[in-house]
């Protein structure tokens, strides 16, 4: 009995000593407890990020004439439709970025700043192919948002959407980055969207998608929902793309893009196997315009393109983005397969027409 009592006392003493040592280790060397340290590092609030950026998100009110098919006579066949949207101040000089669809066909546009001032902006330029528009207001030096880098976003990063949903000014919703580089949505010509589960509602269009540091990483543009009872999936235009569009509009009044005069399509697995292509790279040229740069470089319908400027090409969308990222006069080295043999061609980019074929 005495031996059992001694054993229990020894066991309890060991447990107490072990807990005491563990407690001291956590106090002295918290870096040795990564799980606990990681929890301590998480922000309890994103209020600081909102404070840094919310004043740079403005409200937009537009009016446009809309044809009313139910009008009883010709005099009342049109009605005035009022819409709410958002824009982001990206330059203290008064430059604002919003969506092209926000200002398209608007008969009146008004901007309301976070301090309540209201003015009519000038439209500096638009780019329908990325759904972006650059506006400017003359209200002195304004508080511009800090630009982040959308290329550094990772799936799972926390993001906040700031906008004017349903006319409710400076509303903030939280979510994560669900995906990057989203395409095939048939929303615009050049799709490279950030997908997020942050709520993006009517009026959020043109608003800011920010990271946890309060930096702009995207321009909110669209939400997809299966039906009225389904929570939608939000999409934003990456700030890296928006930055390039803005600079071109500032310099040229429009966006000037390269053009190769070809129509690519994705390869199926069966086509890739038949051609002996072991990697996932490769797109099929289904059309090469006779008077285009690709035809001048002897590219032909039926060619399979593997690389453009040394970069493996995996999809139609990627090929279009590479082509559009050039400027007229740039040379694009193309590597491909024709009738089982590899070839290389040098395409001199032309200027993409406003309504490309």
Where are these regions (language model features)?
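Conserved catalytic motifs of ABC-family nucleotide-binding domains
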Residues: 302
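Short alpha-helical segments in extracytoplasmic peptidoglycan/chitin-binding modules
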Residues: 305
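Short strand-turn-strand beta-turns centered on an Asx-Gly dipeptide
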Residues: 308-313
